[in-house]
């Protein structure tokens, strides 16, 4: 292949590194209304009264909107970017009289500049009726205090939700008699694991600009992964026709799932629709920490049974998930905790997976890279590592005996066949990369420091089966260059480049001959959005099919112009050539074909293709960590992280490697330092990046990523996804390495130096 599987530079690389104006705040006017939100200081309260008189006297103030400006009995909406009908419940109003977490919206203020809005915000007088909050997600289900007591709460999908029980979702599934199988096992690991809420901490905070266009429509320019879903969300929130809303996306300064929720779009949209004036909201870092959409906190009870020979016979998993004050992504994230962990163990005779997602008076959770699989894999992989310890087996060996293989039906994966899998090769590759046999389990450095290794494996999906939709439009322009139109959102992942590579490979042209335009609801073909590891696999396949269709049209018009049948010609990317018949050898250039198509022609040199997949082939990953632990202080130094990934055919190895390295770094942070915590009143404790500790470059050591390619027949040129699976292995790998160093296994993240030092002290 000449373009696909080549390490080409991102199309927008130079513009980004040279600081060109490409982001929301760069490309939108400065002379617009500044929008800010007055937020609740209480975790659960009713606004008894609100007085904005003094605030509105501040020079420059345009408007202040409160719950009195919103129909409290109107239909609610969800901010979750999901295909309609969304699994997430309709539980929000633009401004609700009932505030449900510290940071919930009490009023929307709009003024000429930030200074006047800040001054006005201090003058708004609010009287609250403070209610008892639900802060412990263990006691939320069937708690007498209801987070959503309202009658207009609504669940559109059959996910087991019941607002009268504080249940956002409930599910049960399984196969075989799990209790009988576990009773017959030689060893049963029975443990409870806890993973914390974590922030995506993207560099660009949430932000949106809105204006009324020439036709009286609401034009939204937002940093979002989901332009089409945002159109529906805003229309639902404002109770206006979707035809009155247009959403576009400039470059995005990071998303990682956070911008799969319309966190910021609704508020300036409300202001602009009401005032008919342009407006903009830019979340501060504090707001992005206390009122965003972090990873769901989860607790997983795992029972894993095996024989003495190490064969895993059954897995029983119950997941309790904390969705916070609103249900965005709650019903769907929890499913991945089981359906993206249990299937790794293909020998299992039985499984059971049950889950509850509960409302609490914490910040609403949302989507974050890994989307529930991260949490479940920490639990299941940690249980397998403990099983290996008990049986005296090597963790690599026990996995080699149990993993799913190509051609097998995967347990707990909806009956899907494993159509492409190099997991066995990934295990062997990482085993050698980390020099496992010489380092496992640990080495005493005789200076108060111990070096140890640990490992874990992971899977994810490639889009959502029979739901995610990707589309592409390709057209030939004069001189024979192409325009590729997509609805997917490049949020730094490089899909504007990789999708163009797919098209260029089919059309046999240089990458520079394809101009990519993306993510505008008015002219982009429909795309569900950039999430669920779907862009390369789903939209990429649409692009491949679209390019093939356009190639056929080029040949058809070329044949017509050459006076022969389409079956007689070939196309090499530059010209159409007659291969047989009386005109054999005659050619016409693509440039001439393009020019001819614009004069007296009825063959359109444009194609649009939409694609959805009935399967979601998993990418796989194995990771191993080498750490050094200071037994006196508990400090963990990550020396080396070795990983092997099976993502099918990497479309762009450079971008694929960067995806993997970035995901591993985020997994390191979740394992060792990052956590969203609250005090006993529901106040978030980490409201800046000083308190919320993401790993810096010096904290992540050496990261090495290699690829073991399988070939996925349903993907473009054999490709599967890469974006999410890469965050999942550091959690079990590093935690297992810590156990091997200090002799104590940790079941709750993050594993801080304090916890490790105490464990080392207890061991002494």
Model-found features: residue ranges?
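Conserved catalytic cysteine-centered active-site region
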Residues: 85, 97-98, 241-244, 248-249, ...
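C-terminal catalytic domains of large/alpha subunits in multi-subunit enzymes
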Residues: 67-68, 239-244, 274-279, 308, ...
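Flexible, low-hydrophobicity surface segments
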Residues: 1-160, 188
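Helix-loop-helix junctions that connect adjacent transmembrane helices in secondary transporters/permeases
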Residues: 147-238, 403-481, 623, 685-706
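Catalytic phosphate/nucleotide-handling subdomain of diverse soluble enzymes
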Residues: 462-524, 539
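Glycine-rich loop/linker segments at domain edges
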Residues: 6, 12-15, 82-85, 161-208, ...
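Short acidic, glycine/serine/threonine-rich loops at helix termini
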Residues: 74-79, 120-123, 231-233, 256-262, ...
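Thiamine diphosphate
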Residues: 232, 253-276, 280-283, 495-503
